[in-house]
């Protein structure tokens, strides 16, 4: 038996880059998207950003957090009711980075281990990201058994960088590439213009939904990718998101 699963990921860029102006764009896109499970990066917990995003539409979500570098900031996984997350775990990846994983049983009986992360950002430090990817793989190899693993996030790595090569060698496939034939050319920067915006690095594909095990992508596309009406310099975040429709158990 197979289960359908709709997943998404977005680096929400904390509270920087015209946050008060772009927050309504995040909420509007989330209201339309309503995935089953979503990974968020750069969440500021005291601002309740993850819970606010989860409450933007008709669906209700549980937010599961994993701090990175300091206790008020990090990654979050939103799990849509009535799905339940079990076996929650966090790993520290050093350089103020971490990952979170949860085990989810789907209505048809299939199980998914869903993980979210945000790797080191300095463009030249490919070896750091490669080491972080290796630790992620070891951690996921030791995770509770599941039919499939879904690993999402901002990897700060192009598809040909060692971290991504290592993930593919470990059996992970990019959902976007599986559905479309190749990864998107760019997921950062989005096109936002803001004081103090991050300009370190060339535009490229840095964000992914990785799949391993009995799962395949039937559709994948960019999300949170539309500028504000009347302002082409304002986007939901400095990153574009990705969403994917999956079949788990085959």
PLM feature spans:
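Acidic/histidine-rich helix-loop elements
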Residues: 7-23, 70, 120-128
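Active-site beta-strand/loop signature of hydrolases that rely on acidic residues for catalysis
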Residues: 6-12, 26-49, 78, 102, ...
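Structural motif corresponding to alpha-helix initiation and N-cap regions
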Residues: 20-24, 50, 96, 161, ...
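Metal-dependent phosphoester-hydrolase catalytic domains
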Residues: 141-149, 157-250
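Structured beta-strand-rich core segments of catalytic domains in phosphoester-bond hydrolases
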Residues: 19, 37-119, 219-224
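Short catalytic/ligand-binding loop motif for oxyanion handling, primarily in non-cytosolic enzymes
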Residues: 16-17, 46-49, 71-75, 122-124, ...
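Alpha-helical scaffold elements lining the catalytic groove of polysaccharide deacetylases
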Residues: 125-141
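Short amphipathic alpha-helical segments
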Residues: 50-53, 128, 162-165
């Amino acid at each position: 038996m197979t289960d359908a699963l709709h997943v998404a990921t977005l680096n929400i860029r904390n509270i920087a880059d015209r946050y008060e102006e772009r927050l309504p764009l995040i909420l509007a896109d989330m209201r339309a998207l309503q995935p089953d499970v979503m990974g968020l990066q750069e969440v500021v917990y005291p601002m309740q950003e993850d819970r606010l995003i989860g409450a933007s539409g008709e669906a209700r979500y549980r937010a599961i957090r994993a701090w990175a570098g300091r206790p008020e900031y990090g990654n979050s996984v939103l799990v849509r009711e009535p799905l339940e997350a079990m076996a929650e775990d966090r790993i520290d990846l050093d350089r103020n980075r971490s990952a979170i994983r949860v085990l989810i049983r789907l209505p048809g009986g299939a199980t998914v281990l869903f993980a979210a992360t945000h790797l080191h950002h300095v463009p030249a430090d490919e070896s750091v990201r490669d080491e972080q990817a290796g630790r992620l793989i070891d951690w996921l190899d030791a995770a509770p058994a599941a039919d499939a693993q879904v690993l999402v996030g901002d990897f700060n790595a192009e598809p040909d960088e060692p971290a991504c090569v290592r993930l593919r060698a470990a059996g992970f496939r990019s959902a976007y590439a599986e559905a479309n034939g190749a990864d998107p050319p760019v997921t950062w920067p989005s096109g936002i213009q803001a004081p103090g915006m991050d300009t370190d690095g060339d535009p490229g594909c840095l964000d992914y939904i990785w799949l391993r095990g009995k799962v395949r992508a039937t559709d994948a596309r960019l999300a949170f990718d539309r500028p504000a009406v009347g302002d082409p310099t304002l986007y939901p975040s400095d990153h574009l998101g990705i969403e994917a429709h999956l079949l788990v158990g085959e």
